[in-house]
Amino acid sequence: MWLFAAAGVSSHLTSMLLHLPQAMAGAMLAGSLMLFGLFHGASTYGWRGIVFFIVVCLGVSNAFENLSILTGFPFGWYHYGDKMGPRLFLVPLLIGPLYFGVGYLSWTLARAILGDANGQLAGRLVYATPIVASFIMVCWDLTIDPKMSTITSNWIWRDGGSYFGVPVANFLGWYLTVYVFLQVFALYARRLSATPDRIPGYWAKPLLAYSSIVIAPILSLTLSSALGAVSDATGHAWQIRDIQAVTALVGFFTVLPFWLLALFRVPRPENH
């Protein structure tokens, strides 16, 4: 699991330093985070539990994404460009693994913040964990969506939006989508006999993996040499450096604090 956690960090560095194609960079990140979530999740909830998580996550996220492409709900009107590889219906295949990989990390950070040391959901944690984890995951989208849509056109918002060409509805839709699949999993997981990994590093591994999300917008700002303006689908022009600076700032004050909260709240090995 250390390997997969480290791979998540290195994939960001490699893709930015080598300017890899978006599909390749996305596949590297999605693959490393999904493998990490699979094995770390199995050590906590067993194989049946983590497979249930994956099935619900992929099913709900793909359904909501396709629904929004066709109807505008819940994210808004958009469509994917041609850079993201093969698709499941109207959604690129690598989107699902990203939902799972980042979703599982968000879930695990929420557990640490809420003091869930043993993985046994009970009482308020059944509902509090999905609520907090969904906020954590939406913070990640706040740092990537303007770049991935407005700058690189991996997906295109038909009517643009106030957040550098991204509509506010997108982030509300993200919260709804993530909350639904995490809440379904929480209701299922409370019946499981959780068996969290008791070896040293159980909490350090997801914190390392999530650090790739913490550093990504800052690296994007510092390593990119892109200048000038880009236009969204409505023709509104946005300065590339403004997008990179603001998303780095948003990440610094949203993604990083959640990571630090989890770091400070993580149960000590003797309690685990």
Language model: regions and residue ranges:
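Aromatic-rich, lipid-facing transmembrane alpha helices and their immediate juxtamembrane interface loops
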Residues: 1-272
